[in-house]
Every structure is written in C-alpha cells, then in structure tokens.
Amino acid sequence: MTVADAKKTADQKMQKSIETLKADLAKVRTGRAHTGILDHVMVEYYGNPTNLTQVANVTLIDARTIGVQPFEKKMVAVVEKAIRDADLGLNPATQGEMIRVPTPPLTEERRKEMVKLVKSEAEDAKIAIRNIRRDANETLKKLLKDKACSEDDERRAQDEIQKLTDKFVLEVDKLVVEKEKEVLTV
C-alpha cells in the first residue's frame, strides 16, 4: 500500500459513512410524507420477504399522504398489513387497488425526540469518520516504519487526511442542520 492508496481508501470510506448517514436520516420521520419512510418495509411475496418497492408503486399523493399501488391486485391486503406491522406508526387505508397511507402530524415532544435521534445518528457518523482517520494514520505510520515513505510524505498525508476528515465532519453537520430544520418545521 502506498500513501496515495491510504488517502484514497480513507476518502472512499468517509464517503460511505456520509451515504450511510443520509440513508439513516431518510428513515427519520418528519411531519411531511415522503416515500423513503416505506423503503425498508418488507412484504411477504409468494413466501419470500420482499422489499415493498419491488411489489408496489410508491408515490406521494399530497404533502401528508403516500399512495401505494401494488402491481398485483391480490397483494393489496398483504401490502397493507406489512405497512401496518412495520412499526412506523402509520395506519394505511385501502381504496380499491390503491392504499393510502396518511402520515399523522408530529407532536412537539415527538419532534424533539426526532431531533435527538438525528443528532445521535450524526454523532455515530462523526465517530465512524474519526475512526477511519485513525486507521489511515496508523497505515501511514506503518508505511513510515517499513520505510515505504519519508517522514515528510507521512506528515503531508496526515495533514491531507485531517483536511478530509474536517470536510466530511462539516458535511455531517450540514446534513444534520437540514434534517433538524425539516423535522422542526410544523
């Protein structure tokens, strides 16, 4: 492994941490409806647990209602049950072939809990990014010890990895501020 490889690996891993945070934040419910709420709902499809998005079309009907239209008519009841059992606090209602999923408005107390959850997710992401920095720095020290790079190269690479870390931590903070604003908007 070279110094460039260590930096590239750290960058890729930090980017994955950001993507994971974005996915986790998408699951946090806000006052508005969004299709991401149902992304992890699993439906029993011919005996196999299948992602809801693979057995139904999920759309937004309005700001507070999600529409779910199963591809097969006989799946309507199964999909409705899966949404109800997904422990999301949602109560779907069937209208013919369409399942309407109204999202209830969040109480002030629940909004504050959601903000705490968002901050917790962000802190986990920051910890992951810092751990990646630590691993990269250890790799650089090992390269220096093995005389695969000079002290100057190692020092420069550590500085660049620190800049990367700062950049990604700043991105985490930005994502959190956006999500907090979204959660607290009534």
Swiss-Prot record:
Gene3D superfamilies registered for this protein in UniProt: 3.30.1360.40, Ribosome-recycling factor
Name the UniProt record assigns to this protein: Ribosome-recycling factor
Keyword entries, A-Z? Cytoplasm, Protein biosynthesis
Among InterPro entries, the record links this protein to: Ribosome_recyc_fac, Ribosome_recyc_fac_dom, RRF_sf
Biological function: Responsible for the release of ribosomes from messenger RNA at the termination of protein biosynthesis. May increase the efficiency of translation by recycling ribosomes from one round of translation to another.
Q: State the gene name recorded for this protein.
A: frr
The record's annotation in NCBIfam families points to: frr (TIGR00496)
HAMAP family assigned: RRF
Family membership: Belongs to the RRF family.
Q: Name one GO molecular function term.
A: ribosomal large subunit binding
Localization per Swiss-Prot or TrEMBL: Cytoplasm
Pfam families from the entry? RRF
Q: Which residues form a coiled coil?
A: none
Recorded GO cellular component terms are: cytosol
Please cite one Gene Ontology biological process associated with this protein.
cytoplasmic translational termination
Superkingdom field? Bacteria
